[in-house]
């Protein structure tokens, strides 16, 4: 993918959740909620502070992150759906 986010924005690809319950019931797409986890695909250079210096982002490409249900702007690139969001919209990095 060739896209470079600007400033403190990141590109996130949603992680697909299991579409089947523990008892084996398949959940249709219309009833399934969109996942609130994703993988960072690209990061911007950082946010410019009041002193004029650029503060690098804390997240990096490959990080698995947790974000709010309505975070980011959905975009399609070459048929794939991604989210463009600010670093501050990310609630945490999933480790391990």
From Swiss-Prot:
Family (UniProt): Belongs to the GroES chaperonin family.
Record lineage: Bacteria, Pseudomonadati, Pseudomonadota, Betaproteobacteria, Nitrosomonadales
Biological-process GO terms, alphabetical: chaperone cofactor-dependent protein refolding
InterPro entries: Chaperonin_GroES (IPR020818), Chaperonin_GroES_sf (IPR037124), Chaprnonin_Cpn10_CS (IPR018369), GroES-like_sf (IPR011032)
One GO cellular component term noted in the UniProt record for this chain: cytoplasm
Name assigned to this protein: Co-chaperonin GroES
Organism listed in the record: Nitrosomonas europaea (strain ATCC 19718 / CIP 103999 / KCTC 2705 / NBRC 14298)
Keyword Chaperone: yes
Superkingdom, natural source: Bacteria
Compartment(s): Cytoplasm
Keyword Ligase found: no
Description of how the protein assembles with itself and partners: Heptamer of 7 subunits arranged in a ring. Interacts with the chaperonin GroEL.
HAMAP family recorded: CH10
Gene of this entry: groES
Role according to the record: Together with the chaperonin GroEL, plays an essential role in assisting protein folding. The GroEL-GroES system forms a nano-cage that allows encapsulation of the non-native substrate proteins and provides a physical environment optimized to promote and accelerate protein folding. GroES binds to the apical surface of the GroEL ring, thereby capping the opening of the GroEL channel.
Record keywords: Chaperone, Cytoplasm
NCBIfam families, per database record: PRK00364.1-2, PRK00364.1-5, PRK00364.2-2, PRK00364.2-4, PRK00364.2-5
Pfam families the record matches: Cpn10
UniProt GO molecular function: ATP binding; metal ion binding; protein folding chaperone; protein-folding chaperone binding; unfolded protein binding
SMART domains: Cpn10
Main location: cytoplasm
């Amino acid at each position: 993918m060739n896209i470079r986010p600007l400033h403190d924005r990141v590109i996130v690809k949603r992680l697909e959740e299991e579409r089947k319950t523990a008892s084996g019931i398949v959940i249709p797409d219309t009833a399934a909620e969109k996942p609130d986890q994703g993988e960072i695909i690209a990061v911007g250079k950082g946010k410019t502070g009041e002193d004029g210096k650029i503060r690098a982002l804390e997240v990096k490409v490959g990080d698995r992150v947790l974000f709010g249900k309505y975070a980011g702007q959905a975009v399609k690139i070459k048929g794939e759906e991604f989210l463009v969001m600010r670093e501050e919209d990310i609630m945490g990095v999933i480790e391990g």
